[in-house]
Amino acid sequence: MVLSPTDKSNVKATWAKIGNHGAEYGAEALERMFMNFPSTKTYFPHFDLGHDSAQVKGHGKKVADALTKAVGHMDNLLDALSDLSDLHAHKLRVDPANFKLLSHCLLVTLALHLPAEFTPSVHASLDKFLASVSTVLTSKYR
């Protein structure tokens, strides 16, 4: 999926507003995913998945850091996320459908925390961006 200049601008502007809340929002999105899509818990059998879990917060930071990297490399997501794609496809063997679920939960989380910024245009741009990231993360499954 090709991101237009407007999409890229919307994503960068929104990500800048997230500021130092990335880890917090990442953890909140994961917690939301675990509550609403319980099958996703199977990939974290060693985690305490309770509210305010340090392990979920730590993984939320990893998610946020990966997305921050992706925001900085929107023109070359394939190279920027190649290692993560390998990890999820070959070592962790995450069901590719879970990326869409997490993307949805991230969008909900961002809409809740940034209601003024979450216009229909920004929503569409973030959705396209997260779909592009998901496509890259599942590219090594084939």
UniProtKB/Swiss-Prot annotation:
Q: What does this protein do?
A: Involved in oxygen transport from the lung to the various peripheral tissues.
**Which domain of life does the protein's organism represent?**
Eukaryota
Q: Which family does it belong to?
A: Belongs to the globin family.
Gene3D superfamilies, A to Z: Globins (1.10.490.10)
Which residues does the UniProt record annotate as the domain Globin?
2-142
Which residues are annotated as modified residue N6-acetyllysine in the UniProt record?
K17
- Modified residue annotations for Phosphothreonine: T109, T135, T138
Record keywords, A-Z: Acetylation, Heme, Iron, Metal-binding, Oxygen transport, Phosphoprotein, Transport
Provide the GO biological process annotations.
hydrogen peroxide catabolic process
How is this protein named in the record?
A: Hemoglobin subunit alpha
Binding sites annotated in the UniProt record for O2:
H59
| PTM sites of type Phosphoserine | S4, S103, S125, S132, S139
Q: Provide the free-text tissue specificity comment from this protein's UniProt record.
A: Red blood cells.
Q: What's the source species for this entry?
A: Balaenoptera acutorostrata
Q: Does the keyword Phosphoprotein apply?
A: yes
**InterPro entries given in the database record:** Globin, Globin-like_sf, Globin/Proto, Hemoglobin_a-typ, Hemoglobin_oxygen_transport
Chain positions with Phosphotyrosine modification: Y25
Where N6-succinyllysine occurs, the residues are K8, K12, K17, K41
| PROSITE patterns xref list | GLOBIN
Give an example GO molecular function: haptoglobin binding
Q: Which residues bind heme b?
A: H88
What is one GO cellular-component annotation here? haptoglobin-hemoglobin complex
Summary of subunit composition and partner proteins? Heterotetramer of two alpha chains and two beta chains.
Family annotation (Pfam families): Globin
